[in-house]
């Protein structure tokens, strides 16, 4: 099952979500962020990010990337795609969603999400580790969080690894 925003890309298919396709390209890059690898690639002069969903916690040690199928509306990548689209329409600073894929197999599924890359961005965690966080950065983070809070948008897993600074 694939859903996508057809305003930028008209021809997304299964192959578009395959990491190996993009890794054959010299300009592709792999970053190990969070629970798994993230693929950065270029297509039609646009820069994208491909994220495959991996489980965390104790269960993730035994079942790396499979989730219980509860229907399309309950799938992680579809939910995130729809939420990002909604937040973009609200004018909030989030990555623009391009496509989401769910591969169902029996009672489980795997999931992938593609967004537009926020170029020249680093996670807040990376900036802290590099000792590049000053008063202006903290103020910008605070203003951004306040903006989300004012619109009653609350991230269920907000941490320094998923706050991007550009």
Cite the ranges covered by each PLM segment.
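N-terminal presequences and immediately downstream first alpha-helices
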Residues: 1-17, 41
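Conserved ATP-binding subdomain of kinase catalytic cores across diverse folds
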Residues: 15-122, 146, 150-151
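Alpha-helix N-cap and loop-to-helix initiation/capping positions
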Residues: 72, 132-136
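AlphaC helix of the protein kinase catalytic domain
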Residues: 123-132
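Conserved alphaE helix
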Residues: 136-144
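Conserved catalytic-core element of eukaryotic-like protein kinases
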Residues: 154
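Hydrophobic residue at the +6 position relative to the catalytic HRD Asp in the kinase catalytic loop
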Residues: 158-165
């Amino acid at each position: 099952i694939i859903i996508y925003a057809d305003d930028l890309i008209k021809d997304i298919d299964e192959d578009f979500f395959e990491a190996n396709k993009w890794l054959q390209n010299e300009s592709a890059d792999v970053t190990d962020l969070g629970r798994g690898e993230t693929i950065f690639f270029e297509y039609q002069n646009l820069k994208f990010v491909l994220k495959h969903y991996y489980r965390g916690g104790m269960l993730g040690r035994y079942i790396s990337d499979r989730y219980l199928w509860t229907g399309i509306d309950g799938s992680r990548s579809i939910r995130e795609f729809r939420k990002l689209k909604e937040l973009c329409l609200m004018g909030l600073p989030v990555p623009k969603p391009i496509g989401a894929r769910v591969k169902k197999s029996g009672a489980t599924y795997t999931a992938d999400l593609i967004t537009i890359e926020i170029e020249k961005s680093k996670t807040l965690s990376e900036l802290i580790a590099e000792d590049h966080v000053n008063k202006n950065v903290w103020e910008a983070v605070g203003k951004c969080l306040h903006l989300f809070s004012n619109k009653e948008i609350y991230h269920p897993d907000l941490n320094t690894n998923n706050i991007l600074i550009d």
